[in-house]
Regions:
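Compact, glycine-rich, soluble single-domain proteins
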Residues: 1-78
Length: 78
């Protein structure tokens, strides 16, 4: 597994890579994501990416979620 220190979005990670949620770029989307357990400070791991890149399966807070690429692009990681 690889971890990143530079800020990047969740949509940029490949399967097996992980990061820590830092912030969100879309206020409306951030509410939805936080309700699903994707909170700042939480570790997020990409488990799978569909062949065309959409959706992206992630593990966060002990749950597996599927996000659209747009949704994943609103999550900034550290």
């Amino acid at each position: 597994m690889t971890t990143f220190n530079n800020d990047m979005t969740l949509s940029e990670l490949a399967p097996g890579e992980f990061g820590i949620v830092k912030e969100f770029t879309d206020l409306e989307m951030s509410v939805k994501l936080m309700e699903m357990g994707c909170l700042p400070g939480e570790s997020v791991t990409v488990s799978r990416v569909a062949p065309l890149g959409d959706p992206i399966a992630i593990n966060v807070s002990g749950y597996q979620l599927s996000l659209r690429k747009f949704e994943a692009s609103t999550i900034i990681l550290q």
